[in-house]
């Protein structure tokens, strides 16, 4: 008999991925996740949605590439991750670069809240 968790309902759309992300930004995202009592994966997804909204055409793509990346196990919505992959390919950047742009947005959004 397979184990069925009663704590968290399994979402079949969410898939595990190994993703290379900036270590320092990931630490900040994890701190924000603890403060907001949520999973850092959900914050990463919020950032990915922002990146999809912001980077629609090549004219507004300014990507800051990180040299401080580490492979991290993440869990994302398969649909959302696929859309980010397609957008990154269309823009000529790495998927991880777009995810990190989303991380910058999440960090910036929460830093503004702290200073208000």
Give, region by region, the residue ranges found by the protein language model:
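Short amphipathic alpha-helical segments
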Residues: 29, 38-49, 84, 93-104
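Short Lys/Arg-rich basic patches
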Residues: 1-20, 33, 56-76
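General nucleic-acid-binding
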Residues: 13-45
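Short, positively charged interaction helices/loops
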Residues: 53-91, 108-116
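Residue-level detection of beta-strand scaffold positions
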Residues: 16, 46-51, 71, 80, ...
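Generic cytosolic/nucleocytoplasmic N-terminal low-complexity/intrinsically disordered segments
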Residues: 3, 29, 111-112
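Residue-level signal for short amphipathic helical patches enriched in basic/charged
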Residues: 24, 35, 39, 75, ...
């Amino acid at each position: 008999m397979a184990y069925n968790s009663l704590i968290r309902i399994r979402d079949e759309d969410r898939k595990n991925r190994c993703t290379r992300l900036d270590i320092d930004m990931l630490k900040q995202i994890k701190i924000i996740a603890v403060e907001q009592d949520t999973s850092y994966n959900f914050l990463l997804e919020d950032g990915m949605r922002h990146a999809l909204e912001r980077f629609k055409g090549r004219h507004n793509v300014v990507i800051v590439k990180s040299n401080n990346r580490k492979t991290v196990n993440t869990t994302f919505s398969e649909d959302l991750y696929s859309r980010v992959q397609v957008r990154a390919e269309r823009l000529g950047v790495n998927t991880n670069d777009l995810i990190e742009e989303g991380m910058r947005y999440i960090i910036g959004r929460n830093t503004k809240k702290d200073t208000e």
